Amino acid sequence: MNLNIETTTQDKFYEVKVGGELDVYTVPELEEVLTPMRQDGTRDIYVNLENVSYMDSTGLGLFVGTLKALNQNDKELYILGVSDRIGRLFEITGLKDLMHVNEGTEVE
């Protein structure tokens, strides 16, 4: 399965729109995009998962690592466009309490 990734850089944040399936095979593609952003440490990151049809624990792990790196620079990770199914993953793992997870797609 292919992963579609679109990025936009704003003054105070990066926006990353993801489409497809986030799993052990495709997460490295997203990691290549997120790594320089989180290493930059000057902006929050908004990840829009509106067009993600499936996500496994590999995707969750990537977001935990991204959040940890961002928090070292007092920056935040926002997960937007979360479906009920993917939102449930964040909820049952307790990650919904650690990061900003929202069903909406509006960037603040």
From Swiss-Prot:
It comes from the Bacteria. Keywords: Phosphoprotein. Gene3D superfamilies: STAS domain. Residues 3-108 form the STAS domain. Phosphorylated by RsbW on a serine residue. The keyword Phosphoprotein applies. Coiled coil: none annotated. GO terms for molecular function: anti-sigma factor antagonist activity. The keyword Phosphoprotein applies. The modification Phosphoserine is found at residue 57. Belongs to the anti-sigma-factor antagonist family. Positive regulator of sigma-B activity. Non-phosphorylated RsbV binds to RsbW, preventing its association with sigma-B. When phosphorylated, releases RsbW, which is then free to complex with and inactivate sigma-B. This is Anti-sigma-B factor antagonist. It comes from Staphylococcus aureus (strain NCTC 8325 / PS 47).
